[in-house]
Amino acid sequence: MHQHYDSATQTYVNTDEQGIVRGLTPEEPIVSDADSAQVAAQKYLEQHAELLGVEPAALDNLTAEREAQPVDAGSEFRIHTEKQQFDTTTVAYDQTYFGLPVWEASVAVHVKHDPYRVVSASSTRHPDLTAKRPPAKAIERFKEIDQPTLASLLGLKPGAKAAKSLKITSTRLVVYQYEAAKRQPEGEAPGDEELVAHDHPSLPLPPLPASIVEDGHYVSAVVHFQLGTSRFPLLNWRAIIDVATGAVLHLRPFVDDVSALVFEEDPITTAPSGPLPNAASTLLNPKRKSVALQGLNPPSNGTQALQGTIVTVSDVESPAVAPPTEPTGTDFNFDSRTNEFAAANAYFHCDRFFRLVEGMGFNLASYFGPTPFPSPVDHRGFGGTGNVINAHCLGLAGGTGILQTAFALADLNDLTHPIGIACDWRVVLHELGGHGILYPHVHSPNFGFSHSAGDSFAAILNDPISAAPDRFVTFPWVNIGRRHDRPVNGWAWYGLNDVGGYSTEQILATTHFRIYRSLGGDAALPVGIGSRKFAARFVSYLILRAVGSLTPATNPPKVDQGWVQALLAADLGDWTTEGHIGGAYGKVIRWAFEKQGLYQPAGTIPPVSTEGQPPPIDVYIDDGRHGEYQYQPVHWECQAIWNRRHPDGLTTHENPVVGHTNYAYVKIKNRGTKKAQGIRVKAFHANPTIGLVYPTDWKPMATAQLAAPDLAPNSAVEEIVGPFKWKPTQVGHECMFMIVSAKGDASNVSNFSPGETIPEWRLVPHDNNIGQRNVVPVAFKGPKDWMAVISKLPFTLKNPNRRASRMQLVATLPRVLVQRGWKLELLNASGSPIKGGSLKLGAGKTSDLSIRLVAGEPFTAAEVVKWRDAMIRIEGYADGILIGGMTYPMAPAQKG
């Protein structure tokens, strides 16, 4: 993908390698006066047709329905669907030709509500489309296609056993672009990264006639049918058949599987790590954990079955292994190496996944479409003897939802005492989080560019508590070579290994995992567990919401032709059920794909092996990351912001004088590839507080904003902006904030509507346009002097959450002072020590605090200069999430 900024419309434009526009992102959401999301989308397309590369005439029938039979019409767009999630509606328009939908070709507009405002648009349209209209007789033949005709077209021999199970479920006409590589699913042969080959059902299709050419468009019939195989007695398929010749252009079974993966939170993930899957029950059993099986139906006639409101364990595939039952009041407690244990795990994990999705605010019935609930799960299936290491998720007719999920084994060394692969939460996440969520939205088990996002869920949701020796092995119990830390050299987008399937899935998992790490996944343990869990949950929500915005026509054929845009649109929407406003993480998402090789300069010839380019304009305040987005826990220590007591322009920080005019300064740079113009810097201050909320707690300085000189690209120059006049009123050094923006690079605060608020910990570290300084240098001559000054620097702890939270303060002293017996106590407003640094605060409530030092062995100012950690740092946590802090460097006494 290449990206440029269109200054006329203030829009970022993404184009593919052929220069076709694939995405539009306004610098700021475009507010519409429309009375519906569809009207807002229609107006946006009409106003931006040229920018999107669409002829205005192609938009004349946006509200018309797609045709069932060919009519006299060229390439145009017609309404397909509206999909609402939380506060955002995706309005999707199918590209049509002859009035028929063009397969997987669409324009989608993402519209946020109250008021309606367009946040982005994506396109998978086919440029320069032409197709021949087939004869009327050929069209009539496919109106009434029967089983024998279809069997012949599929290459099945008359009277063959397989043909007897053939049943047509639906047909419709489309325009399809033929690609030889996509005619049938190709099995991935074993190699350096795989231990076993991946088996996909296929049929002996007849050869294509000479009239079928690569990239040609053909009026075709989409035929959904059932056809059993030896492994899958009930299997739904899709064939796309050229109407004129009867040639099968595309064939897919609605099934997908993952090979050689294997336990609950698997024994490698849980501490202590181990044992391996070939271990005996005596070694595996200690890893078992007693959990409540939620949603079970009441016992019937004194017998409890593994059947619930969301999931039911059923023997729907061979081998015939009936699920266990227990007398009323008896737990499902079994040895690890038993089919019964696998059944209990199958119920728990599959139910757990659906409840995870539901708990994030997604309605199961609407998100999973026609998927029947309770969803059938076979703990010991997969066809035949089932003696394989595998699992799969089958689709309904037409691939519109989940038919059933089946699990085989996790180890083949002891088939007398089998251990099921359903015991591995990571495998369940790959199946249901990968294929299960794709079926109802794109009517396929796969993305157009990658196997799925299942590896991403497996990696991200298991990482916060993982004890695995290598956190980047995606399935650590039986290592099949799949990783989520693939280097850009060799594993870039459009690189050597971006070939689809499991290979590209590793590139996708690496990119998603980088987002997770930036949002808190790299927080230090054990204190950072809350930040890790929040990041894992939020990134999982973004992936779910992005998938939920897709349609069969917008299933991304390439990562930069719909998926990146879907993630960015998901971020801009508000997570209404959790109380998180959207728009905080878009820059991190863009950066994560950039680091994996996307956004190359125009004209770059694949294979890509280097990181991509930053945005054209990317002004920033350097917090030590040079404008990038690696995890930054101490986001409040930005040294590019400082105070002077006089407007002298010097760069050494001076503590502000309360009640007097002070002068703030900031350094800014431009990481982008183009010169930044129209730069402005806004300045704010706030009471010395951990847990601040924007904009509630941020007060503009007396000099609220200043213009800044143009900035050269590539961080070549640094400009100092100031002075900003301000008058602090609070003892203890008020917090200082700066926000820089330029034409083409607005801060994330521009994404927020009036009345919306966001805590600093979600805002500041994820927007390089913003800098924050809660740094209070403490001047002293000796230990007693230092103790006295510190005791006079009060601060406030605020709970920024919308619910009551357990607050935790973690204070650190210089290592040398700890060794010399120094201690630090945190005191409440009445002067009493806070036991364990922990207290509970209601939503938005505050507590005034102060610091008391308990002296140990003495030290001198001369010694302090040699210490690398000569500071007190106080970190604040709310329900385990790092929300901010205060830092007090030890410094020689200042003059003046």
Regions found by a protein language model. Name each.
Residues 1-160:
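Preferential activation on post-signal-peptide N-terminal prodomains/segments
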Residues 2-7, 11, 33, 176-211, ...:
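Acidic/polar low-complexity interaction segments
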Residues 39-51, 58-115, 242-247, 253-256, ...:
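Active-site-adjacent structural elements in enzyme catalytic domains
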Residues 105, 233-236, 421-422:
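Short, small/polar residue-rich loop motifs at catalytic or cofactor-binding pockets
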Residues 123-212:
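Charged, low-complexity helical/coil segments in non-catalytic cytosolic or luminal regions
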Residues 175-213, 272-282, 312-326, 330, ...:
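Surface-exposed intrinsically disordered loops and tails
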Residues 283, 322-361, 368-611:
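Extracellular protease catalytic domains of secreted zymogens
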Residues 607-896:
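Extracellular/luminal regions of secreted and cell-surface proteins that mediate adhesion/ECM remodeling
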